Amino acid sequence: MSSSKVKAHKVHLLIEEIPTIEQMKKSFLDLYDGWKCPSCGLEDETFDHVWTCDEHRSLLLKIKNNTIDLLLSLLIEYNPDITDYSALLMLNIWTISTDPDNFTFVDLIKGFIPLELTQILNLWIQLLLVIIEIRQYIYEQTFKEIWIRRCSFIKEFERSLGITKKKKLTLKNFRPFNNILNSDRELEYKFDALDSIRNNIYFGKNIIEFYSNLTS
C-alpha cells in the first residue's frame, strides 16, 4: 500500500470512519441494509465492533500481548536499570474493550497515545522513538491480522452476490441531491474541525475550551 493510502487509512482510523458495514450503509443502504458483522454474523459492524468482535478476540489479545512484550524490550534496551513495570502494566490501555471514560487498547489502534502512558514512559526514557515504534507496530498488526482478512472476506462475499464496484457507483450516483449536499457539508465540517484541533494543539491553546465551543 502506498504511503498516501497508509496516511489516509490512519486518518480514517483516527476519526472512526473506516468502511465498516454500518459506515457503508450511509452511502449504499439498498445494498447493505440488514447486513451484520461479516465475522460473527450477529452484531452490527460498527468501528468498535471490528476490534471487539468475539471472532477477533484471540487475535487482538495476541497483538496486545506482543505489543507489551515489544514495549518492555524497548524499555530495557534504552534503560536497563528499570526493574518495576507494574505501573505500566496496570494501565487501562491494555483492556480489550471500549470505555467512554478511559483509554483502552481500541484507542491505541486509532492512533491515540494517552497522557498517562507518556507520563510513565517519561520517567524512564526519551520516549519519542519508542512511541513511534509502538504505534506503528499496533497499526501494522491490526491492519494485517484483522482488517485485511475482514476485507478479503467481504470482497469474496460481495463477488459471490454479483456486487461490483460499478454497481456501487451506480447506486451512489442516484442518491437524492439533498443527501449529496448534506454529505459534502458534513465532510467540510469534519475537515474544519480537524484543522481547528490541530491548530489548538500546535499553538498550545485550551483544547477543552475548544471542544466546549465546538459542541455548544
Residue ranges and their predicted role:
Residues 1-216:
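Family-specific functional microsites
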